[in-house]
Amino acid sequence: AMPWSEFDPFLSALVLDYLVDALRLDSSALEPLQLLRSRLVRSVNLDPQTIDDARTSAYTLWVLTREGTMTTAQLEALRASMTSRFEGWERDAAASFLAAAYSRLRLRDEARSLVKSTPSTARAAGAWTPETAAALAASALSEAGLGQEPAARFLVSMAGEDLARTFAAGIVSPLYAAAAARAALTPEVGGLTAGESAASPDLVCTRRADG
């Protein structure tokens, strides 16, 4: 995720997720955050060919929304692409990331329409694992004010079970460790207070994208 390294969309989005929090504590995080944000905005894939790529794009859009970027048009484009290409995507963690972004934009109806189904992380592959998907999706829904939705509570429970099982086994990948730590910063999973969690930029969408 560094300027001189090969660009990895998922890892870059995860780094930006952490930088958003780091900026609250240290203004020196602003420059790397701005550089990474610009790169992610330019590179987000709105026409993914696999559900794993779609999940990465959805997570990226959630993190960009959380950071303060207006993403309404991209959310609409990605949602349309997934609807036409991936049957049952509404149960994937990708739907949770889109719901979180819509909620942060105060598009509540769109957000809640995407957390009606019981989530499943079984399809997670590529850069993802089921455990990583559950941890980051639970974190996103919690931070977006959807933590009391049944889908979010299911993901929180799943993430907690994954965490206990994985650490008991003693084998933890760096990416999963980062995702699990990210989840631990949210109120429902444990970490930040509700007030601290609410300190992120609050965007309001005033005009929907055409189409």
Feature-to-residue mapping (PLM):
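Large, well-folded core regions of big proteins
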Residues: A1-G211
